[in-house]
Regions:
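Phosphate/diphosphate-binding loops
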Residues: 211-213, 289, 304-315
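N-terminal glycine-rich flavin-associated loop
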Residues: 260-268, 302-307
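Short coil/turn segments at secondary-structure boundaries
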Residues: 17, 154-157, 260-263, 292-297
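Extended, domain-scale alpha-helical bundle/helix-rich regions
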Residues: 81-116, 121-147, 172, 208-224, ...
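N-terminal accessory/capping or targeting/presequence segment of soluble
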Residues: 1-90, 105, 109-203, 307-310, ...
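Short beta-strand/loop turn elements enriched in aromatics
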Residues: 10-15, 20, 281-295
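Short, basic/aromatic beta-hairpin or loop at an interaction surface
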Residues: 22-26, 291-305
Length: 315
């Protein structure tokens, strides 16, 4: 790792769990932190120094990190109230250079390191792989009527999915589409990062962005960025009749699926956690679910390891 830092002309490297859409719950194939440390938890970044590699995990993953990390990696176990970046900063010398992958951190997070010497990297030296994503075709709901005062660049995938009505059910535990969007009277949807970058480079006017969700890379391309916290969250809180009916239908289906799983547990013998997960998937899909919203958290005998992989041991 010393040679890598020397080659990049930096003293430290921040290694992220997020991908280029700033999504933490992404495939391990594009998770640089997993590539470096072997830790498969959904959150937590790593820091490479000239002497050590540090992995930062919250209370959900203290035991799992010890079980999974590669040798010679120091696990920093965050306690309640501790913030990851605060602990990272304690390991930094402000006079030395921290390398940050511009496409994998938000502009807001980058600015939180003000006062430290930063070198932005265009590509990830640990894992620069990016999964391919399909062009969205499924319209789950009608598009929303959202008319901002000025041209707005939206980078939050949940918000893009909400405004367009598009959904992508090809990925596990996700229905959001992988796209960015500009609204300037018309709606311009970018499913290709290169096309989006070219648009940002050539756009000469003011562009409203949310620093909490735009990557530092995209932000640097914009000539006249105006930061404004997204108001789409408030818009999402007002449900249409169609959305309310969809919720009611989903709640009813969930009740039926969970009652069936409960009956399975009560009546079957010699089953494992993995058996129950398979049954849960079956019952939800039987009720019409396209997929599960998140990986099941199911524990019978290892309650302290809620987020680790399910066991096949019979119970």
């Amino acid at each position: 790792m010393r040679e890598l830092l020397k080659k990049l002309k930096i003293d430290y490297l921040l290694v992220n769990s997020t991908n280029e859409f700033l999504v933490e719950y992404s495939a391990l194939s594009e998770n640089a932190r997993y590539t470096l440390t072997g830790f498969s938890g959904s959150t937590g970044d790593a820091l490479i120094t000239k002497d050590k590699i540090y992995l930062f995990v919250d209370g959900r993953y203290h035991i799992q990190a010890d079980m999974e990390v590669k040798p010679n990696i120091e696990v920093v176990k965050l306690e309640l109230g501790q913030k990851q970046d605060d602990e990272i900063k304690k390991l930094l010398n402000p006079l030395k250079t921290l390398g940050i992958v511009a496409k994998k951190v938000s502009q807001a997070r980058l600015e939180s390191f003000k006062g430290y010497k930063i070198k932005l990297l265009e590509s990830d030296p640990i894992n620069n792989h990016s999964e391919t994503h399909i062009v969205p075709t499924i319209v789950a709901f009608p598009p929303k009527n959202y008319e901002p005062e000025k041209t707005t660049f939206i980078t939050n995938l949940e918000e893009v999915s909400y405004l367009t009505g598009y959904r992508d059910f090809t990925k596990d535990y996700s229905s959001k589409i992988w796209a960015k969007m500009v609204i300037n009277g018309d709606l311009i949807l970018f499913t290709d990062n290169e096309a989006c970058e070219n648009y940002l480079k050539n756009y000469k006017g003011e562009l409203i962005v949310d620093k909490n969700t735009i990557s530092a890379y995209d932000y640097a391309l914009i000539k006249k960025p105006i930061h404004k916290a997204s108001d789409i969250k408030e818009l999402k809180s007002i449900k249409s009749e169609q959305e309310i009916n969809a919720y009611k239908k989903a709640f009813d289906a969930t009740d039926k699926a969970m009652m069936a799983v409960r009956k399975f547990i009560e009546t079957e013998n010699n089953i494992s956690e993995a058996d129950i997960e398979c049954r849960l998937r079956y019952e939800f899909k039987k009720q019409g679910a396209k997929n599960l919203s998140f990986k099941p958290i199911l524990q019978l005998i290892r309650i302290r390891l809620l987020h680790i992989i399910l066991k096949t041991q019979k119970i």
